[in-house]
């Protein structure tokens, strides 16, 4: 895999909250997206999802509580766990799903 700048890649994406696959390591897909202030409805997946913020912050609603993930932090969403994006998230998000 070549050297990647997640912040640079996300700034080039035409649409916020639409991820782009930038690589794969074994079964894990690595995606990047640009966050904006919008909220997004609750969702869940049948796979684990690591949410790594490289710039800005991600505000999540999980099990009735708010979790803020800051730059340099990662939140692991276990398979089947409902989670929503709360208003005010912004920056660059790297998603690793297995």
Q: What do the predicted segments below correspond to?
A:
Residues 79-98:
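Ligand-binding loop in jelly-roll beta-barrel domains
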Residues 1-33:
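A short, N-terminal "cap"/entry segment at the start of jelly-roll beta-barrel domains
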Residues 29-45:
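Conserved short histidine dyad/triad with adjacent acidic residue
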Residues 37, 47-59, 63:
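Glycine- and acidic-residue-biased ligand/ion/polar-headgroup-sensing regions
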Residues 18, 28, 36, 65, ...:
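A generic "binding-loop/recognition-motif" signal
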Residues 26, 54-55, 70-71, 89:
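A cytosolic small-molecule/anion-sensing beta-strand core signal
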Residues 64-80:
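Short acidic-glycine-tyrosine-enriched beta hairpin
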């Amino acid at each position: 895999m070549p050297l990647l700048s997640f912040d640079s890649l996300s700034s080039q994406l035409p649409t916020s909250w639409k991820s782009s696959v930038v690589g794969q390591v074994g079964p894990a897909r690595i995606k990047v997206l640009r966050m904006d202030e919008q909220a997004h409805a609750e969702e869940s997946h049948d796979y684990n999802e690591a949410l790594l913020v490289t710039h800005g912050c991600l505000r999540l609603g999980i099990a009735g509580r708010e979790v803020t993930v800051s730059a340099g932090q990662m939140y692991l969403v276990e398979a089947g766990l409902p989670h929503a994006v709360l208003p005010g998230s912004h920056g660059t998000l790297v998603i690793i799903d297995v």
